[in-house]
Each structure stands twice: as structure tokens, then as C-alpha cells.
From Swiss-Prot:
The species this protein was found in: Brucella suis biovar 1 (strain 1330)
The enzyme's E.C. designation: 6.1.1.9
HAMAP family to which the protein is assigned, alphabetical: Val_tRNA_synth_type1
Listed GO biological process terms: valyl-tRNA aminoacylation
InterPro entries reported for this sequence: aa-tRNA-synth_I_CS, aa-tRNA-synth_Ia, Anticodon_Ia_Val, M/V/L/I-tRNA-synth_anticd-bd, Rossmann-like_a/b/a_fold, tRNA-bd_arm, tRNAsynth_Ia_anticodon-bd, Val-tRNA_synth_C_sf
Family annotation (Pfam families): Anticodon_1, tRNA-synt_1, Val_tRNA-synt_C
Protein name: Valine--tRNA ligase
Subunit structure: Monomer.
Domain of life according to the entry: Bacteria
A Gene Ontology molecular function term of the record: aminoacyl-tRNA deacylase activity
Keyword Calcium among record annotations: no
Length: 910
């Protein structure tokens, strides 16, 4: 007999151990002979990471699919692993050194510092893997990989050297996102925009050959900027070619204030005639758009910042070129050189004002890009870096999605994928860090570069080049973390070696990931997979949405609305969290997570536990020779039919990535049909004297529960595994753990039995609804009058008389020609069901109560409708607040409809 309650905290570790002992998650476990492979690679979490709600959703979805396909007998591999997370890991260890008052990395030296990171990884790096196991992730943990382990490092070397020799990796001077605190280039995903209240400064740039007069607008052009310090690097002013105001000036120069550099006025579509003066200052070395304008118009790129974002003028050859070093300019150079960018901004504005070049200052709120780890504003920065020719690699990656070899689900993301791929920029893959894959490039005395897999090979190449042995210096940069991640689908399977795993599991079946890394990871895996394997890395990409708080707001520490999945698992168990995420994971829709929902789905687990316990108390046990088609009782044939339908819906839902529909189908069958109705129908049979009926009911209930455990296992693996082991045939053990049991393939359906019992369910539900709407006391027993019933309906009433009276609290059923006075009515098929209310409730008092309720609802609806009609409210309120009001309005409209129905019934009855 089951314990009275299910203890998730005590059971989950025990079940995890059972799976481990059974080897249930090993590649190929439980596979049928000759089965098709089903392979999934986990999006590797950062080694520094702790499980967050995004991980919980992502890995729940993967685990649902993996457990489902494993039970269907496929040859399953779920490949786990962890990302070395360059910047994040280096920062964690640097912080640890500072906290322990140990020498910093520079004092320690590169080699010792990297040793220290490996030591940290050995001590703390396994935390997220353990948290994923706790969630129930059924990966083949014996195959866990790390992006810096020896095998993957070999794959990275092979790819880098091959691409270099194919001319697809090269060194170039371009703009990058530069973090002046961490002193490295960072990727776009590591940049976050923050709304900052700042200013827009409007400056006067004097025209050449015209005496500058601040009072005469014909002597200057006005440009505006949010970053005045960058004007020191201006090399042009752009105007739109269609802007007639500037036609005569295009090709002439302006003189850069404070500096004296002559810079051309160029015609370029980038300039917007409607924005400000229509003229734009161009600083190619410090703005991504300006860099492109500069390339189109052959403008110089002058970098005026140090890596730390201080001004550099004194020894800056590019800045000083062609400048007349007047006393005024020398003084400016002395004053500004080495000054922090923000102090320089303030001083430059003062100087522009003093010399008549400041037109005006506007308050201006704008998005300022910050490094998400360094936390300071990043700078577009001109520097030498390593690049991948992504444009070339993108072509086959686009073709693979266009011709359907790889499908993106939901399909609407394909447009985003193509938009990005068609406009792809060279991919900057170098980082100025110590932790990561060091770039395999060595430089000779004259700077000649040798890219090889080892230092010995580089020395041999240098010897061949110079005709003698020379000293080589290795590039100190490391590769972007996304570079090694881009190889994940094949590097984890042993490439560049030709392994059996690679032959079996590549290409993988499906990739599950968030839409936010479609470009940073998915597209790059497509490029690398197609280039090196000459085959797509996955057949399907399933992109899930974000997990937000219950109001629809993005979770962030600053908002204080972060929901911790580990805390939720402590309180409700892993199954409740998983089921909640699954049933809310509608395609393309963000998950709005309310912890109250998780409590609700824990109750669902409790319902199943209690149903099993109730069944055991009534002698329900597996009958080995039970066959659905042999059941005789309509109620059993009905539940077996509904079980087949539910199985079909769950199977289709998972197979088509509609996890919410699959979970919903399982939920409705278990809670509504099996627990609320079927077990209720069985009570008189269990208490009766018909032993044959009792035995059939017991066997049917046991069979249904067995299938339910299987259907729910991908969603709620822990509880279902425990129930499976505790409900084996008397005196026997199960042949296998539930994780390796066979997925139900059911075909039994009895349309007549289903129609018959579903009619009974609809009748009782309808009568109960009317009673609830009319506030009929729960204990009151009411008569029922039936009008216009045909023979089938009359027979059904006769056949189910006892059940109707017991379940709907009905004292007698009569068939009449006319509705009695004071009766509420409902339609069921061709018949009208009348419930006389006069003796049960005070119709007048109930009408008054309903009118009052309708008034309250109408008033609140009016208030919300006015709010939503207010354009200022919709424009200025937080998105989640507006959404909450819209949702409340929908709820109120539904409530108003219910009250209107009840009022209509009262009127009819009166």
C-alpha cells in the first residue's frame, strides 16, 4: 500500500540512483534492434552557472523528448556538457583571488593563473550538472564533455588551422565592441543596452574659406552628438545626397573645432534629412555606422582612445597626421592626453562653448551599450583582431534551411534567420583574455604569421620561410567561447577522429534552445557543421520563448523578480516544476510563471498519487492477461477509449513540439476523466456484490494507471517511476525501470460506449453547473423534468438512473410535454433538461444578488476599458502592467457572460 503522501524530497534522490544503476540514460539504452538514432546535444551551460528558469525550461523540453523517444525504442543519445565560459570564468577566479587577498593574475602569470582556473573548475565546476540531474535530465552523464577538454581542444585547433589555410580566417583592423574595464573585445550578446538620461550636444563646425561667425549660420554646419569626446577623431561630415540644403557644400571641407583638421562634407544615404540639421559628424574609428560610411567614402579612421578608454593624442600618429601644431592645439593635447573619456567629454563641451562652437544642449534619454559583465559603457574600438569570413560560410547554412534539410520551429523564426544571415558581418573570434583556447598563431621577427596546430609545426613552417631557425612569439589572444561551441554537435562525438558515435548520431535529430541565441550559436553551428561534416548538424531547431514573471516582466536581479528553480524544487518537487513549464510552453509564447501555478500542478501529482492509493485500497492490481477489447462494462470500454484518445494526443503533441498540448491532454485525462469520473463510477461496483464486474473494473483501472504512468513519465519522471515500482503485479518486480518501459501504442476504441458515458458526464456536469450558478444549497436534492427526449435518450436515462441520482443529487426523473414553472433549463442533444428551482432557492433574492454582481463587474470593466483607451497609459506604463489589465478585462468579460447566463435562467424560471 502506498504511503498516505508522496515525499518528493526523499524520493527523488532514490529514483535518480535507481536510473543510474539501471544504466537507463546510457546511449542506446532500451533501443529496439536496428532502431533509428535520436540524438540531442545539450546547449552547454556555463561552468560558472547555476540553474536558472531558462535552463529549467530548456532542459525540461529536451528531457520530455528524450524520455519519449527512448520509450519508443529509438537509439537515444542526449549529449551533456559544459562551456568553459571565457570571460565569466576568468572574472570568477579573479574575484576569488581578490577576496582571498592573493596575488592578481598579472602578478601570478598566465600559466599559474590558468592552473588556478582548472583547480577552481575541479572544485566548483560541476554544480550546474548536479542541478540538471536534480531536475531529472536524462543525459548520458558518462559522456559529459567540457569545451576545454583535450578532445574538444583538438577539434578547435583543427578547425582554426583549416579555416586559416582556406583563407576563411584572417586578421583585420575593424571596429569591435570593446570593454574598457575587462580590456577585451566582447560579442554582441555580451552587450546590454541601458536607458540613460543624458544630453545631445549640438556643435557648429566652421566651413573652410569662410570666416567663422557664431551669429551667422552660413559660416558653419551644425552636427549633434551624445559623445562629444569622439569629435577629436572626426574625419568627415555626411549629408544626404537628396538634401538640397547641402548640394553646394558636398565636396568642400569643414574645419574640425579645437583640432583644426580639414574634413570633407560627403553625400551618403546614412544621413537623415529629417533628423536635426540633417548633417552627421562621422567618426569611423568610434562608431559602427560611421565605420561603414567611412569605408564607402574613403575617410580616415583615427582612434583617439586607449584600451582603457582614456584620450590618446600625444604620441598618436594617426591623430597628428597633417595637423598644424599651433600653440592652442599643443595646449589641448597636453590637457586632454590621458584624461578619462567622461572627464574629457565635460572639458571638450566647456572648450566648445568658450570658443563659440556650442549651439545648444538638449536633454536626451537614449540607449547606451554596456558590457554585461564589466558593467561599464562599451566603446566601438578600432583594433586588430582575428575574423571568420562568416559571409562565405553562411551561404550553405541558408540553403539548408531554404531547402528544408533543417527546419526551424516555430517557422516564423526562419525569416529572422535569413535576415541576419543575408546581412552577416565578419565574425570577430579573438578575445584579449587568458582563459580559453589560445589562438594557434606564432609571429616571426618581422611579424610574419604562422598558423599551425603546434609550436613544433609553426617552427618548421618558419624555418621553411626564413631559411633558418628564428624565435617565434605566440599570439596571446584566445578564441571567443562561441567558436568552440559552434563545433559542439560534432566535436562532442569525437571529431576529427572518425568515431562510431559520429557515424551513428550525426547529424543530430533536434536542437532545443532559446530564440535569443539563434545567431550566436545556432547559425554558427550550421556554418561549421556544413563546412566540416558536409552535412547539417541537426534536422530540426526548436526555439522556445523566455520564462518571465507572472506579470510578463523579464526576470532580473535589479527588479527583484527572479524566480529560483532550485527553491521551487525544494518546495514543490522537480515534477511539479517540470509539468508547469511543459503545460505553459506554447510555441512562440513566453512563459509567465506564477509559483501558485506550480503549487496547482503539485496538486495534480497528489491527485494521481491518491488515485493510485484509492485503487490499491479497492483491490486494484495488474492482471497479466487483461485485454481492452475483452472488457464488457460500458464504463470500462469508455475509459479505455478515452485512454487511447489521450495517448494519441500526448504522442502527437510531443512529436510536433506542442508540449503544452501534450501535457494538457495528459492532465485532462488523468484529472477529469480518470479521477473525477471513472473512479467515481467505479465506487458502487467496488462496493457491490458482482464479483465479475468488480474484477473487470480492478483490471481496467490497473491497466489505465499503468499507461498513465508511461504517458506522464516524460513530464513527471520521479513520481511516475516511484508509482511504477510500487504497483507491480502482486509478489513480482517490474522487468525494467519505467524510463525504459515501452511507450503505449493503443488502438482500442468503442465509439458507442464513449458516446454513452460522455452523455452521462455532460448531463451531470450541466446539472451541477446550473445548481452552482443558481446558488442551490449543496445538500438540496432536486427533481429533473425532461422534454423532447428521443428513444436513445430515454434509454440512457433508464440505464444510468442510479448514477444520475447519486452524482447530480436528483430525487426523481420524469418525462413531460411542458416545462414546469420556476425551472432552470439546459439543452443536451435534442432534449431539454428542466430543474425546478422554486422550492430550492428564493428566485427574487437570487435575481437581486446577480444584478448586484453584474453591476460590480460592469463598473470594473468600464474602469479598465477607459484605462486601455488612454494612449498615455498604454505608451508609458510598463508592458507587463498593460498586459495584466488586458488579461483582467478578458476575465471580467467571461464573468459577465456567466452572470448573464444565470440571470437568463432566473428570468426563465420566474
Amino acid at each position: 500500500m502506498l504511503e498516505k503522501t508522496y515525499d518528493a524530497a526523499a524520493t527523488e534522490p532514490k529514483i535518480a540512483e535507481r536510473w543510474e544503476e539501471a544504466g537507463a540514460f546510457k546511449a542506446g539504452a532500451g533501443a529496439k534492434p536496428g532502431a533509428d538514432p535520436f540524438a540531442v546535444v545539450i546547449p552547454p551551460p556555463n561552468v560558472t552557472g547555476s540553474l536558472h528558469m531558462g535552463h529549467a525550461l530548456n532542459n525540461t523540453i529536451q528531457d520530455i523528448m528524450v524520455r519519449f523517444e527512448r520509450m519508443r525504442g529509438k537509439n537515444v543519445l542526449w549529449q551533456p556538457g559544459i562551456d568553459h565560459a571565457g570571460i565569466a570564468t576568468q572574472m570568477v577566479v579573479e574575484r576569488q583571488l581578490a577576496e582571498r587577498k592573493e596575488p592578481n593574475r598579472h602578478a601570478m602569470g598566465r600559466e599559474k593563473f590558468i592552473e588556478r582556473i582548472w583547480q577552481w573548475k575541479a572544485e566548483s565546476g560541476g554544480m550546474i550538472s548536479n542541478q540538471l540531474r536534480r531536475l531529472g535530465a536524462s543525459c548520458d552523464w558518462s559522456r559529459e564533455r567540457f569545451t576545454m577538454d583535450e578532445g574538444l581542444s583538438r577539434a578547435v585547433l583543427e578547425v582554426f588551422v583549416t579555416l586559416y589555410k582556406q583563407g576563411l580566417i584572417y586578421r583585420d583592423k575593424r571596429l569591435v565592441n570593446w570593454d574598457p574595464k575587462l580590456l577585451t573585445a566582447i560579442s554582441d550578446i555580451e552587450v546590454e543596452s541601458r536607458e540613460i538620461k543624458g544630453h545631445l550636444w549640438h556643435f557648429r563646425y566652421p566651413l573652410e574659406n569662410v570666416p567663422f561667425d557664431p551669429e551667422n549660420p552660413h559660416t558653419y554646419i551644425i552636427v549633434a552628438t551624445t559623445r562629444p569626446e569622439t569629435m577629436l577623431g572626426d574625419t568627415g561630415v555626411a549629408v544626404n545626397p537628396k538634401d538640397e540644403r547641402y548640394h553646394a557644400l558636398v565636396g568642400n571641407d569643414v574645419i574640425l573645432p579645437l583640432v583644426g583638421r580639414h574634413i570633407p562634407i560627403v553625400a551618403d544615404d546614412y544621413a537623415d534629412p529629417e533628423a536635426g540639421s540633417g548633417a552627421v559628424k562621422i567618426t569611423p574609428a568610434h562608431d559602427f555606422n560611421d565605420f561603414e560610411v567611412g569605408k564607402r567614402n574613403n575617410l580616415r579612421a583615427i582612434n583617439i582612445l586607449t584600451p582603457e578608454a582614456a584620450i590618446t593624442l600625444k604620441d598618436n600618429v594617426d591623430f597628428l597626421e597633417d595637423l598644424e601644431l599651433t600653440a592652442e592645439l599643443k595646449a589641448l593635447i597636453v590637457e586632454l592626453d590621458g584624461m578619462d573619456r567622461f572627464a574629457a567629454r565635460k572639458r571638450i563641451v566647456e572648450l566648445m562653448d568658450e570658443r563659440g562652437y556650442l549651439e545648444k544642449i538638449d536633454d536626451h534619454t537614449h540607449a547606451v551599450p554596456h558590457g554585461d559583465r564589466g558593467g561599464v559603457p562599451i566603446e566601438p574600438y578600432l583594433t586588430d583582431q582575428w575574423y571568420v569570413n562568416a559571409g562565405e560560410l553562411a551561404k550553405p547554412a541558408m540553403a539548408a534551411v531554404r531547402d528544408g534539410r533543417t527546419q526551424i520551429v516555430p517557422k516564423n523564426w526562419e525569416k529572422t534567420y535569413f535576415d541576419w544571415m543575408e546581412n552577416i558581418q565578419p565574425w570577430c573570434v579573438s578575445r584579449q583574455l587568458w582563459w580559453g583556447h589560445q589562438i594557434p598563431a606564432w609571429y616571426g621577427p618581422d611579424g610574419h604569421c604562422f598558423v599551425e596546430k603546434s609550436e613544433a609545426e609553426a617552427k618548421a613552417a618558419a624555418r621553411a620561410h626564413y631559411g633558418e631557425d628564428v624565435a617565434l612569439e605566440r599570439d596571446t589572444d584566445v578564441l571567443d567561447t562561441w567558436f568552440s561551441s559552434a563545433l559542439w554537435p560534432f566535436s562532442t562525438l569525437g571529431w576529427p577522429d572518425k568515431t562510431p558515435e559520429l557515424a551513428t548520431y550525426y547529424p543530430t535529430s533536434v536542437l532545443v534552445t532559446g530564440f535569443d541565441i539563434l545567431f550566436f550559436w545556432v547559425a554558427r553551428m550550421m556554418m561549421m557543421g556544413l563546412h566540416f561534416m558536409e552535412e547539417i548538424p541537426f534536422h530540426t531547431v526548436y526555439l522556445h520563448a523566455l520564462v518571465r514573471d507572472k506579470h510578463g516582466a523579464k526576470m532580473s536581479k535589479s527588479k527583484g523578480n527572479v524566480i529560483d528553480p532550485l527553491e521551487l524544487m525544494d518546495e514543490y518537487g522537480a515534477d511539479a516544476l517540470r509539468f508547469t513549464l511543459a503545460i505553459m510552453a506554447a510555441q512562440g509564447r513566453d512563459v509567465k510563471l506564477d509559483p501558485a501555478r506550480i503549487a496547482g500542478y503539485r496538486n495534480f501529482g497528489t491527485k494521481l498519487w491518491n488515485a493510485t492509493r484509492f485503487a490499491q485500497m479497492n483491490g486494484v492490481k495488474l492482471a497479466p492477461d487483461f485485454r481492452p477489447e475483452n472488457a464488457k462494462l460500458a464504463v470500462n470500454r469508455w475509459i479505455l477509449t478515452e485512454l487511447t484518445r489521450a495517448t494519441r494526443a500526448v504522442t502527437e503533441g510531443i512529436a510536433t513540439y506542442r508540449f503544452n498540448e501534450a501535457a494538457g491532454a495528459a492532465y485532462r485525462f488523468v484529472w477529469n476523466q480518470f479521477c473525477d469520473w471513472y473512479l467515481e463510477f467505479l465506487k458502487p461496483i467496488f462496493m457491490g456484490d458482482d464479483e465479475a464486474a468488480k474484477a473487470e473494473a480492478q483490471a481496467t483501472a490497473a491497466y489505465c494507471l499503468d499507461q498513465v504512468y508511461k504517458l506522464l513519465h516524460p513530464f513527471m519522471p520521479f513520481m511516475t517511476e516511484e508509482l511504477w515500482s510500487l504497483t507491480a503485479s502482486e509478489g513480482k518486480k517490474r522487468d525494467t525501470v519505467l524510463a525504459l518501459a515501452e511507450w503505449p501504442e493503443l488502438s482500442f476504441e468503442d465509439e458507442d460506449a464513449a458516446a454513452d458515458i460522455n452523455w452521462l458526464v455532460d448531463l451531470v456536469t450541466g446539472i451541477r453547473s446550473v445548481r452552482a450558478e443558481m446558488n442551490v444549497p449543496a445538500g438540496a436534492i432536486a427533481p429533473v423534468v425532461v422534454l423532447d427526449a428521443n428513444k436513445v435518450t430515454v434509454d440512457r436515462f433508464a440505464r444510468h438512473d442510479a448514477a444520475i441520482k447519486r452524482l447530480a443529487r436528483v430525487e426523481r426523473i420524469s418525462f413531460e410535454q411542458q416545462a414546469p414553472k420556476g425551472a432552470a433549463q439546459m439543452l443536451l442533444g435534442e432534449a431539454t433538461i428542466c430543474i425546478p428551482l422554486g422550492s430550492l432557492i428564493d428566485l427574487q433574492a437570487e435575481a437581486a444578488r446577480l444584478a448586484k454582481e453584474a453591476g460590480k463587474i460592469a463598473a470594473e470593466m468600464d474602469r479598465i476599458e477607459k484605462k486601455l483607451a488612454n494612449e498615455k497609459f498604454v505608451a508609458n506604463a510598463r508592458e507587463e502592467v498593460v498586459e495584466a489589465e488586458r488579461e483582467r478585462l478578458v476575465e471580467l468579460k467571461e464573468a459577465a457572460q456567466r452572470v448573464a447566463t444565470a440571470e437568463s435562467r432566473i428570468r426563465d424560471a420566474s
